[in-house]
A protein has these predicted regions:
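Generic low-polarity alpha-helical segments
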Residues: 2-3, 71, 150
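Rossmann-like adenosine-cofactor binding region
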Residues: 9, 15-107
């Protein structure tokens, strides 16, 4: 919903269509073609590992920006560096990398218009406050006999 505040047209690509989603839901390649800002918010699974690769990057607009705050291996770093250096996309902002701490060999280290933060996107006060609220709610639920987010 934050993108709405900036007047952005939001397009969603997900394995399972969310109920009552106010946004257009489409496949990942169509989303990549339409995107001015393509952001990733997914877990690392066998299906998502290397998902952002030459195929997706090749259909993006030359003015598009890629943002990854999910998991580093979702992005193929060599393909992204090539897309940035050949100006197939405009920029990338990454809070996660394939290897952390950053490998001295990553091609993203010298890629054009690539900004890398040290896995701290969660560190804003508001985010940490929300995290504490969730933990407290989970403890209250557990004490009340209704545990949440069980891992058995």
């Amino acid at each position: 919903h934050l993108a709405d505040a900036f007047g952005m047209n939001v397009v969603v690509s997900t394995r399972t269509a969310p109920k009552n989603c106010p946004y257009e839901v489409t496949d990942i390649l169509t989303a990549a073609e339409k995107a001015d800002f393509l952001t990733f918010h997914c877990p690392l699974t066998p299906q998502t590992k290397g998902m952002v690769n030459r195929d997706i990057l090749s259909v993006m607009k030359p003015s598009a920006v890629l943002i990854n705050t999910s998991r580093g291996p979702v992005v193929n770093e060599a393909d992204l560096a090539q897309a940035l250096n050949s100006e197939k996309i405009a920029a990338a902002y990454l809070d996660v990398l394939e290897k952390e701490p950053m490998s001295p060999d990553t091609p993203l280290k010298t890629a054009k218009n690539c900004t890398i933060t040290p896995h701290t996107a969660w560190a804003a006060y508001e985010t940490r406050s929300r995290l504490v609220d969730i933990v407290c709610a989970n403890i209250r639920a557990w004490l009340g006999g209704n545990p949440q987010n069980k891992v058995n």
